[in-house]
């Protein structure tokens, strides 16, 4: 049986062999691995890029005080970004399942069409959910637009839901029963040992104690700071301010402080920031001459 951390190590080893830069999680609150600069920003422009990383993801509204066996306000994704998307991307994915000990001939693996959209990022793509014996474990996406900019070349994104994948591999019904590691002297460390208290306390904070007045003020500050930084222009710091605004919105949403009509307006404000950041980042790479594209050409010429 693979432990939770062995699943991560296996995926790291597999995607390392496929030429991916193995990166670290983005060190800010994000709702999904797509928000990492290694995906959102690197999907913009013509430069080639391959990366893989674990991303802790926060969705405050999904908290259940640690009482739901498969719904969390903090969970893990394993993200793979391939640009340009290779024609054999599905075969590469199946290869990763084999590395995890999943024999495609012995399991029901289905690709269910499910086009993807993230309104706050101004991003969308053609995609599929991957169902393993009736459980969704992965999302495939071919990005068409990011930050309102067309993706040329197309970026392929593979997002594994690590908890769901681990629940299948370990054959458990509750995320809290997952074995994180075997531990010293055979003393198992379970997911509940690592995260259950965090789920209880963060859910309590998100739903009951987060200050709406403070969060509204923070949102306005982060929005203003992102706009100011784009005028400099500093695309990457501006993106971080936009991410902070997005997480603040998610906290307000969980707190029930935003009405249905206000929600659409706030999403629009974040989307406008994302689009402006995307353009600023593209412009900054263009000013640099798209260095990774030039580097690839130089390497080819040298060969």
Swiss-Prot record:
Per its UniProt record, what InterPro entries does this chain match?
Answer: aa-tRNA-synth_II/BPL/LPL, Gly-tRNA-synth_heterodimer, Gly-tRNA_ligase_asu
Q: Which GO terms describe its molecular function?
A: ATP binding; glycine-tRNA ligase activity
Oligomeric state and interaction partners are given as: Tetramer of two alpha and two beta subunits.
Q: Which organism is it from?
A: Bordetella pertussis (strain Tohama I / ATCC BAA-589 / NCTC 13251)
Q: Which gene name belongs to this protein?
A: glyQ
Catalytic activity as recorded in UniProt: tRNA(Gly) + glycine + ATP = glycyl-tRNA(Gly) + AMP + diphosphate
Localization of this protein? Cytoplasm
Alphabetized, the UniProt keywords read:
Aminoacyl-tRNA synthetase, ATP-binding, Cytoplasm, Ligase, Nucleotide-binding, Protein biosynthesis
Name of the protein this chain belongs to: Glycine--tRNA ligase alpha subunit
Q: Cite a single Pfam family from the UniProt record.
A: tRNA-synt_2e
An example of a Gene Ontology BP annotation on this entry?
A: glycyl-tRNA aminoacylation
Question: GO CC: one term?
Answer: cytosol
HAMAP family hit by this protein: Gly_tRNA_synth_alpha (MF_00254)
Tell me its EC number(s), please: 6.1.1.14
Which PANTHER family does UniProt cross-reference here? GLYCINE--TRNA LIGASE, CHLOROPLASTIC_MITOCHONDRIAL 2, GLYCYL-TRNA SYNTHETASE
